[in-house]
Amino acid sequence: MKITVVLVLLATFLGCVMIHESEASTTTTSTSASATTTTSASATTTTSASATTTTSASATTTTASPSSSSKKKTVTHYKRKVKRPKKVRKITRRRGLRSRNGRRSDE
């Protein structure tokens, strides 16, 4: 029961943040996340989260001067591209009987 309340609150918060980000920004954002949990007799837990964000924006400004005899055009191009690497976090916990024997510092 407590977990479902927490999950609903988390989903609501993430929804509000995503709506706020989409309204505030006019750039293109691509995000992907994946999580994997594996538990066995040796109790190894692996959590992997990868996020890749690519942002690009471009603007073109054209200025013409009507007072001169020949038409002069100034075209300015702006282009920005940002790519961030994915982040991987790995947690390994050993709970087996063999690994407990190796942890004792008394003997």
UniProtKB/Swiss-Prot annotation:
The cellular component terms of Gene Ontology attached to this UniProt record, alphabetical and capped at eight, are: extracellular region
Sorted alphabetically, the keyword list is: Repeat, Secreted, Signal
Name the protein family: To NG-2, also to SGS-3.
A Pfam short name: New_glue
Q: Compositional bias (Low complexity) spans?
A: 24-69
Q: Which organism is it from?
A: Drosophila melanogaster
Q: Where in the cell is it found?
A: Secreted
Q: What is the name of this protein?
A: Protein new-glue 1
**At which residues are the sequence repeats?**
31-38, 39-46, 47-54, 55-62
